[in-house]
A protein has these predicted regions:
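Conserved N-terminal subdomain of the carbohydrate kinase-like
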Residues: 49-136, 326-340
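Catalytic-core regions built around general acid/base machinery
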Residues: 146-158, 181-188
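Glycine-rich phosphate/adenosyl-contacting loop at the front of the ribokinase-like
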Residues: 1-74, 95-97, 114-117, 265, ...
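Active-site metal-binding loops of divalent metal-dependent hydrolases
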Residues: 10, 166, 282
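Hydrophobic faces of well-ordered beta-strands that scaffold small-molecule active sites
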Residues: 162-164, 192
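Conserved post-catalytic alpha-helical subdomain immediately downstream of the catalytic base
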Residues: 264-333
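A short helix->loop->beta-strand "cap" motif at the edges of active sites that frequently abuts
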Residues: 156-161, 233-236
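Conserved phosphate/ATP/ADP-binding segment of small-molecule kinases
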Residues: 172-259
Length: 340
């Protein structure tokens, strides 16, 4: 079985019940999530051999965090244990015209304070086919940027396919710093995942004719973004998600895959959102699964978008649908009727 390694931070998520605001909350629901961990869970859920690499404290909350991955079948044996802090983030779910809000409390988390010598990449990459990371990981600290670069170099040396979701987070670093660091890291990447905001924020590449707030998405603009990214870094594939925001609850959702020659667009879904956190990660998980299982370009983008569409109907960061459910939606069964 093909093995995948995902590298990054896993955090505890605290959210008011339902659509409650932070200012109303007297209790919080506890779950766990993080961009790369969410991808690992998706892949394990599809029956793939997926491992997550990070540094997580040994205390009880850290163990609960690790157990959340084990429950979903993710290999946690490569996680470094130690440090004092587990990152925390708070999510207030939006409704109608009120947007969702996220507050991070992740400074000095164990993974951000990790040292290069704590990760033996020769051992971690033993028998591995695919390595996935996101732009969040090198943004956590200078050490993490150096560790991510070391991992990419070792993966490339071993012939491992490398994917990266640009995932720009302005609360972690500036556009200038992100552009400098990511430009070096992306030299090693085979598959780039992004949206139009990431491409603009990190590399100054803009999708002409697109205004996501107005729901205006230009296919030609997205094609140009993908081509510029591929030409600049030599990516074999560029996948770009297309989200049209109608309200906090209702979005149009689609994506495009560029293979260096042709652009393939998925069908468009109008989603009534239950929880959009992890939606992009479930797209990445679906993309990796499809590519590793020999799907053609059109099948790949349809599977990835359908997986992400379904995730956004599920509470929490983790996608919890089967391959058959994704294939059914990708094949046109979008009625939502009761299955008996």
């Amino acid at each position: 079985m093909k093995k995948i390694v995902c590298f990054g931070e896993l955090m505890m998520r605290l959210a008011p019940e339902g659509y409650g605001r932070f200012s109303q909350a007297d209790k919080f629901q506890v779950t766990f999530g993080g961009a790369e961990a969410n991808v690992a869970v998706s892949l394990a859920n599809y029956g793939m051999d997926a491992a997550f690499v990070s540094k997580i404290p040994t205390h009880e909350i850290g163990q609960r965090c690790v157990n959340s991955l084990r429950f979903h079948g993710v290999d946690t044996t490569k996680i470094v244990r130690g440090g004092e802090r587990l990152g925390v983030y708070y999510v207030e779910k939006g409704a109608s015209q009120r947007p969702s809000k996220v507050i991070y409390d992740r400074a000095y988390a164990a993974i951000a304070m990790a040292k290069p010598e704590e990760f033996n990449w020769d051992e971690i990459f033993e028998g591995v086919t695919w390595f996935h990371w996101t732009g969040i990981t090198p943004a956590l600290s200078d050490n993490m940027a150096a560790i991510t670069l070391e991992a990419c170099k070792k993966a490339k040396e071993k012939g491992i396919t490398i994917s990266c979701d640009l995932n720009y987070r302005k609360k972690l670093w500036t556009r200038e710093k992100a552009g400098q660091v990511m430009a070096e890291l992306c030299k090693y990447v085979d598959v780039c995942i992004a949206n139009e905001e990431d491409a603009a924020d990190v590399f100054g590449i803009h999708a002409a004719g697109t205004d996501i707030n107005a729901g205006t998405l230009s296919h030609e603009g997205y094609k140009d973004v993908a081509k510029q990214l591929a030409d600049r870094f030599g990516f074999k594939y560029v996948a770009i998600t297309l989200r049209g925001s109608i309200s906090a609850n209702d979005n149009d959702w689609a994506a495009m895959l560029y293979d260096g020659k042709e652009c393939y667009f998925s069908r468009n879904y109008r989603i009534h959102i239950v929880d959009r956190v992890g939606g992009g990660d479930s797209f990445g998980g679906g993309l990796i699964y499809s590519m590793l299982n020999g799907y053609d370009a059109q099948q790949t983008i349809e599977f990835a978008v359908a997986a992400s569409c379904l995730k956004q109907t599920i509470e929490g960061d983790y996608n919890q649908v089967s391959v058959d459910e994704v294939l059914a939606l990708a094949g046109g069964n979008a009625s939502g009727r009761v299955q008996r």
